[in-house]
Regions:
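Class I S-adenosyl-L-methionine
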Residues: 1-8, 18-194
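C-terminal target-recognition/interaction regions appended to catalytic cores
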Residues: 153-289
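Hydrophobic beta-strand segment of the Class I
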Residues: 11-12
Length: 289
């Protein structure tokens, strides 16, 4: 797996978060999701087989209370690793979305820790900082110079709904004839962010694989009558502006859901960068002794 001349062997894994996420609670008992629960155990077996010097893992905060996570810790500790884990708030590390993630680091060389936050509430990156300069597009339109700056079309009814939605508001801002039946019930209170618009001067809500649809969360553009474009979702995940998720030869001929799956399932590159810098810092500290 590693070249023979490798000095330090690092293994990084991220089991699918759906079995542990509160967002996907309704899917947690379907067959595909149940199979994914075993993947952290599989990662533990690979660690025992490969014997890397350093291990890292990322997932949703809910995982830390699950038995599979405790088994994973036990495997690491029994194999001589010093383990540390922490729930981080993504804006603290330059990710412009209200995302909390569980980050784990483990080393055979000794104690290892995650680098401290780089941002604070007074300078968190905001939605405006991240997507404010992108060209305006309509629902269902693709910007001619960037095939990824593409927004899903809206039905006439959903267009009326988003036009009555306010940044940071809820479906309670709508006229009664626009309400879904579910929202008229007491249980409808739990749908507060659905069909909502984001706010310019705050970090965005967590980007999921469903962000191109306004009915899936607070994914409405603050001003334009549409959901976030694929490019906007990618930028909020901290991918570079020129990052390509599809073969350029495809142009605009690709399913929006296919690309949204890649974007929403990704570890934000800036969080990945922090993990990498933390590992480098750990190794540099070892060299000083």
């Amino acid at each position: 797996m590693y070249p023979k001349d490798t000095d330090i062997r690092v293994l990084i894994g991220c089991a699918p978060c759906q079995p542990f996420s509160s967002y996907s609670h309704k899917y947690q008992n379907n067959e595909n999701t149940l199979k994914k629960k075993d993947l952290l155990d599989y990662f533990g077996k690979q660690i025992e087989l490969v014997k890397p010097d350093i291990v890292s893992m990322e997932n949703v905060p809910q995982m830390q209370s699950r038995e599979v996570f405790h088994r994973f810790q036990d495997i690491l500790e029994k194999n001589g690793y010093k383990v540390t884990y922490k729930v981080v708030y993504a804006p603290d590390y330059g990710v412009p979305q209200k995302r909390k993630r569980l980050l784990l680091l483990a080393s055979k060389f000794g104690d290892i820790s995650l680098l401290g936050p780089e941002f604070s509430p007074d300078n968190y990156p905001t939605l405006r900082d991240t997507i404010g300069n992108l060209p305006e597009i309509r629902a269902g339109e693709t910007y001619v110079q960037d095939p990824l700056h593409r927004s899903r079309n809206l039905s006439a009814l959903n267009l009326k709904r988003i036009r009555q939605s306010k940044p940071g508001g809820t479906w309670r801002d709508w006229d009664k004839d626009l309400l879904l039946e579910a929202y008229k019930k007491e249980s409808g209170k739990s749908f507060g962010s659905v069909y909502g618009r984001l706010e310019w001067d705050k970090p965005a809500n967590t980007i999921t694989t469903q962000f191109p649809g306004i009915g899936n969360g607070r994914f409405g553009h603050p001003e334009q009558d549409r959901a976030l474009s694929l490019r906007e979702g990618a930028l909020l995940q901290t991918f570079p502006l020129n990052y390509e998720f599809v073969d350029p030869k495809q142009g605009r001929n690709y399913p929006i859901s296919q690309v949204a799956l890649q974007i929403g399932n990704a570890v934000p590159p800036k969080l990945g960068e922090i993990i990498g810098k933390s590992i480098i810092n750990h190794l540099e500290e070892l060299d000083e002794f």
